[in-house]
């Protein structure tokens, strides 16, 4: 210190020279300076110290004496309010203290800590300075307190100076004065680790051995025994507990007794001492219900635990949460204590659970003590024990991220597929803790990364909630879906935007997270809405750059689209309403027209009935009827120049004039007769278009347009007629003024044998006498006013008859008919012999198309050819008129219901025939497959018979394979007459008999072919039936008529381009 002072004052001013002289003990220089300047004797330096204080610090007694004689102030204080006496007491300099006290130094002066020189004298082991001060002090001044309300006795006990304690107690110092912490000198004396502190304790207790002093508690409730136990001073504990009034089970503010502190600190000897001197015989517990054994177990003090377990009064009781000391030890990883307890207590329950269901293994897994977990598993601890939350020890380890413990538990048989009461899996808890390594371990143990809890949340959402990017990356790299929604519709992006984790948001968008997913609640917030609500500006900017929308923007877009759809709906609805209105108007127009036609038909029917009642009025008065169809060719041969061309004659009838009436006057007809030829020539140019229009109106082959034109240029509507039923007369004559013939397909029913005589009689009665020399006049007869037949009769005939178009695919069902366009239909007579009948039929069908395609495309050609055929038939047959086989009907005069019935009946018949063909094809394929399987089974059976038939089996197998793979199956034609041969007379009885004789199976297996020969529209190739000859005991299989057009497969048929070798049967 002297060197430092010298350095401090070296080269300083005059004042510094005074302090330097005091420190250096240069009495002469000090005196010279003081004589030169008397103010220098109390001059303060930068610390406020005077030369006298430096003399005390430097122990310069002679210089101090010189300064005091020069008049220096003895009570002068420095900046810390200490005087020279404080410094002398602090140093324990008895001589200076005595010098200063003789110069009347103030011993009650307090420094900034409110300490007097008396407090400072207790620091030294020698009691001389303390005794010197006590001589100058009054009796009441000995208990002066400092800033901490501590007296000199407190300091003496703290410094463990038993002599100072005795001296102060002798001078009537109070031993029961508490300081600022409530401690009395006995607390400070017991709170000492030195065994010699027992003397200080004894000095105080000897002065006042009272119970209150011995069990005095400070402001924290601790007694001197608590402090003695805490310091581990066995001698002091022994002295304190030797008094009977000492309370061993005294609680402090933590509800801990001295025994708790001894166990917590591991003082086994003190524990034994306290247990022995515990007269109550019970082990108290603290505020948590823990006994001293719990504290000893968690601190891993095996010796202390052994002392507790060996004492008979100690039991392993549970705390307030049901945990035993064994669980405390497992939670702290106290392996030594666990081994000690397992060895000393054989009845210990290792799987005992607390009130939450947790076991010792739960506690060890939660704390991450691998060695403790292994020790417990070795002692048969239950690895999948669940608590009240259905958490196993593995859940606790995953939550805290203890990888080693997780792997140890999994190796020990812990299940990884369990969930807790909220549906959280192990992966959920690992994600909530942000443990990426644990997530990877769990995924490697076959845990689904997209597993959802009962709220629908995935581990990825849990990781996104905490912003654990590494954990999120591990999950999404293992195929975790970032777009999975929970039950409220939130995704991982919602949670990241809500908490403002920008890095997590970038990671989610990199893994194709949808930025506009909406919630399922009423608000329907998107991730951008969460960012807006949290005012996450960086997140908002980033989300907007990546196409994120708020719910308001989505609603605007949806409203725009809804409006567009609604506008389109209104337009379509208006269009439908307009269309329905137009259709309603059209229906009303059609109903009015139908009603008008019905009224006209009733009127005509009434006129016809009236004409039948007076048949004489129906006959022409001056002119004969027009000749029949058989006479037309002869007339044309006599006047070829006046006959119109065949092409024009075959066209449709002329349009009817609305001005004409059904019954024209006879005079008008006579006036126009001379213009027939010219009219016929003039109307030829208009007939093609008219014929096309009339032909398009015919919906059924059984109904025809037969308009008639009057002689005055007016058109007379034709009278509808249908086929005559049996017993019906064909002699109803119709006289019309037409200019050409129209040939259209019709349903001709040839009169049966029973009808011929009756038809002839009716024809004879109704027609004029026919003469072979009779020449038809160029003038046409007027149309009779009476009609030919009643409407009711015609309706019955149409409903009862069977109509079939010329293009029908059923054999023998289609027939042609020659219809006169301008006159009544000719009366066909039954041929007198079969040759004539065959010629008639052959002539009718010889020019029909050979395929359905030709039938559809050649309607006009069919009409023309049929017309010419009619003329040929008329020449070959008897010119005498025969009974009518059918009459033409005007389709406009038929009811709509009747027309629809006819069309529907014909469609059903065609559909039935197509189904029969289809069934026949299926049966044929099944039959062929059956025969092949039968033959193969036969070959297999031959092989199993033995070696005797091996050669025969090989021959037959080779023959079958060669014939199948080389496609040499012989095709044969049906052994029937050619199609070109004239068919029999197309009578009703014949066609009906043939249709009943034939069946589908017979057509398949080739037993009957007549039904296919007489089809007028089927070609020779189409009517030929292919059949396979018997090959290797394979019976003959007859294909259907469409087998020639079936697909050619490489394994059983030749290619379509390769010629087929046909052999005659």
Curated annotation (Swiss-Prot):
Instruction: Name the cystine pairs.
Output: none
Q: Provide ranges: composition bias, Polar residues.
A: 627-640, 677-686
Q: Where in the cell is it found?
A: Cytoplasm; Cytoplasm, Cytoskeleton; Cytoplasm, Cytoskeleton, Spindle; Membrane
SMART domains, per this entry?
A: ANK (SM00248), IQ (SM00015)
Q: What does the record say about its membrane topology?
A: Peripheral membrane protein
Impact noted for substituting residue 493 to S = In NPHP2; impairs ability to target DVL1 for degradation
Q: What is the tissue specificity? A: Widely expressed. Strongly expressed in the primary cilia of renal tubular cells.
Against InterPro entries, the record matches this protein to: Ankyrin_rpt (IPR002110), Ankyrin_rpt-contain_sf (IPR036770), IQ_motif_EF-hand-BS (IPR000048)
Using the UniProt entry, name the condition the protein is associated with.
Nephronophthisis 2: An autosomal recessive disorder resulting in end-stage renal disease. It is characterized by early onset and rapid progression. Phenotypic manifestations include enlarged kidneys, chronic tubulo-interstitial nephritis, anemia, hyperkalemic metabolic acidosis. Some patients also display situs inversus. Pathologically, it differs from later-onset nephronophthisis by the absence of medullary cysts and thickened tubular basement membranes, and by the presence of cortical microcysts.
- Subunit architecture: Binds calmodulin via its IQ domains. Interacts with APC2. Interacts with alpha-, beta-, and gamma-catenin. Interacts with N-cadherin (CDH2). Interacts with microtubules. Interacts with NPHP1. Interacts with DVL1, PRICKLE (PRICKLE1 or PRICKLE2) and Strabismus (VANGL1 or VANGL2). Interacts with IQCB1; the interaction likely requires additional interactors. Component of a complex containing at least ANKS6, INVS, NEK8 and NPHP3. ANKS6 may organize complex assembly by linking INVS and NPHP3 to NEK8 and INVS may target the complex to the proximal ciliary axoneme.
Domain comment in the entry: The D-box 1 (destruction box 1) mediates the interaction with APC2, and may act as a recognition signal for degradation via the ubiquitin-proteasome pathway.
**UniProt protein name:** Inversin
Please tell me the species this chain comes from: Homo sapiens
Which gene name does the record give? INVS
